[in-house]
């Protein structure tokens, strides 16, 4: 039996030996156990009356869901899936499997604007959220993808300040912050100038299909805690946006909890084996290591993903190509452009591009 000196008493919930035996039984020793204790206390904290657990059908989400089902003594958790309007059949089947396995109901929330419609109306994702966001702003102001200092360009495009700073690489303090400029991405500026996009670029699908539906559900549902299966070691914009597993929001009606934040790949694999868990066919059959929005061009490995989709869900593959095809081709052209410069076939010094 564990010693209570190991616990941080963060709630008025009366923990009993029975509860700790439950945790010891389900969670192997090590980081899984220590992190599970924190999650148990947070879920059963008296302050939280209704908890939104965001279920995606991915492997991290599966682990978090398994925790919640086993830890939620007072049944405060509501399991919610945000349907983007472009989902794998494998994911849909897995959600049904999870409902049957755990005897729960997963609430499906539709996108405010489904991804196919959003891409048609607002633009298609290209390369990354930041790149798409800034290119969208520039496109809306009929930017000509030209060179010039920020001050020179601002005279021509006075209502596009932030995106111009990204393009010119100049900021108010006079310093170039390379991490957030177009020049920080190798040869991207040169490629865009040589091959201006002929289609609208945007990151709005993330907003309308995920962020906005989540905000609306939280407001209308009266939740006071939101749980998300983000892990620090997985990287990406989501993980980099946080420094800890918990955010107490003074300006919102709910707090954010990321119970798996400090869980490593090894911890996760150990837990899956210990519990005999089964992930969706995207992992078990297709061989995916991780999943994001299906077919999204933000995925640097979208070519490999498309090959898998074409093999296992050919109809879905056609949908992805129809929706994101122009972005796929633009990304391929960018990659070939970089290869051409590196091989000397494209001469930057002579302007042969």
Model region roles, listed by residue range:
Residues 2-267, 272:
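ATP-dependent adenylation/nucleotidyltransferase module used to activate substrates
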